[in-house]
Every structure is written in C-alpha cells, then in structure tokens.
Amino acid sequence: MFEHLSLLLLLLIFAAAAGAVWIAGTYLSNTTDVLSTRFGMGEALGGMILLALVTNLPEIAITVSASLSGHLEVAVGNILGGIALQTVVLVVLDVFGVGKQSSLTYRAASLVLVLEGVMVIAVLTVAVIGSQLPDTLIFARVTPASLLIFLLWAVGLWLIGKAQKNLPWQAHGPTLPGDQPEERGHSKKKKDDNARQQQHSTTRTVLVFLAGAAVTLAAGVLLERSGEAIAGHIGMSGVLFGSTVLAATTSLPEVSTGLTSIKMGDYQLAVSDIFGGNAFLPVLFLLASIISGKAVLPHAGKTDIYLTGLGILLTSIYLFGMIFRPRQQIARMGIDSFLVLVVYALSVLGLVAISGSQ
C-alpha cells in the first residue's frame, strides 16, 4: 500500500508518526510512573518491566508488524539496531540534561546500574550466538536462543532487585561525593504528588495511559511501513534505514523520559530506563518467533551482528564510566559520553561500507 505513495507524502506520514510517538511517549512515561506508585508495583515491576514495555511500544509494534508480514530481517534490524542508538540517548541526556554541572555517570554512579549494563551485554551475547544456529532449530514456535534470552532477562531482573535490597555495599554503603541526594525513583513519587494536586484520578490516569499506548502502537506500525517505503524510494538499504533513522525515531520516548527524570534530579532512573529498555528489546525475539513460527535470529545479517557488537561496546564504555566516575567534560559531556559519540559516528561509516558491499 505505502509503496505506491509519493516520497513527499511518505515523509509527511513518517514525520507525523514520529511526532505522535514523541507526544504519546511523554504521556505514557508520566502515567506509568504515577500508576506504578499508586499500585505499589515496586522498582522491578513498575520500573524495569512496565516502563521498558511502555517506552519500547514503537519497537514492539514494528516487531509485530514485521513478523506478521514476513519481513523478519526488519524485525531483527529493529531490535538489534535500536539498542546501539538508544545507548547514544545517554549522550543526549548528558549534554542537554546534566549540562555543565558534571558528567552523567558521575551523578548516576551506582553498582546496580553496572549490573543492569552487564545484563544488556549478556542478552546481546546470546543474540550473537543464536544468530549462528540453524533456522531449523525450533520447537513449538520457540527457539533455544530466544528462550534463553528471556530467561536471562527474568533472572537478571530478580538479581538486580536483590542487589537493591539485600547487598550491604548497595543498601548501607557510604554516600559518595556528587551522588544524587535523593534515592533512585524519587521522581515517580513527585509525579504522583503533582497528579494528586491537579486532582487526576486513577481512572483518568489509566485512560490516558491506554490512549497513549494505542497511539504509540498505531504510530509504530506507520513508522515501519512508511519507513520501508521511504528506504525503497531513496535507494537506501532497509536495514541501514531501520538501524539509523527508524531507530532514532523510536528512541524519542526514551529521550523524553530521560530528560524529565534528570530535570527532577533522578539521574540513576534516567540511566536505568535506557539499560532496562536495551535489556528488554532482545526479549522481543521470542515474541517474533511465536508470531511468525520461524527462527528469527538466523535472519540476522552482517549489519545486525555489527550493530550488536557496537551495542556491547557502547554499553561497556558507560560501565567503565559508572565505575571510574569521571568529572571532566568535553563539550558539555563526560569523557565516556564523548567516546560513545565518537565511536558511534565512526560506526556509521562502517554501516555504509557494509551496505555497499552487499
């Protein structure tokens, strides 16, 4: 349907869908925080699970749409390509959120965040392993790699929840200079207090949440369909378009959510939202295989494996930043963010080279 539309009309549809994702994503993140506080969901359920689902609704919609239409390579590119770019969102938060105060990782330093980053690396490593397995290795519409990714994610959430509550170095350790003064997640309580002051009932909040989810899902489908047609019009590789332009567009909710958290002084939550979303994205391979009835990861191409390695590298840079907590800044960003930006910019040249050789 979209292939027959003019390039101008396709660009308008894509831009409108991107705007819808940005606006709806803002409402979704705010209502999610309010609802998780009112229903007492806790950090694990209300944070890393529910918010990961909410901020990744565009990716979920694109994965479902691509799986139903048989474009499994688009589903793979959407999942793996988005992780590297969503990590670059931390650069945006460092520059426009924290600014000249100090680096983001200096403010957000937490060993729990290091564990979250390790979980991202773990699920991405399994994704690389799964891409090398034969596509005939599937039973009851489930592949070993996609199931292992889901189990790693679930166990990782449990361990992170345990680390936040029971490990003495986290729960009772001394406060370090420059740490955020309030506990992680305090911005959620503030959002709930503001909603109560404005007399926003739970019913109204739920309705806004559902409306935002519906708009985001519909916009995600439009982004995938119009983006694929745009790539065809301009002669650009669909995988390259998906891992750059489309991935940047679907990362808009994370930008909005992160800037809001940093504005309220919740630096750790801002980083956790990115790591939590990145760890959740590979879980969508299980959803894609169930919908399509095929092994999805073996459809990963050179570009997808390249981007997965890039995601691991960028995450590793930030893990070093969490541990060493650099205060020095370059162009309003921490040294780690500067390195991430440089590595990502150079990696785009590699993407072009890979696309040109195929």
How does the language model describe each region?
Residues 1-358:
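Hydrophobic alpha-helical segments, chiefly the membrane-spanning helices
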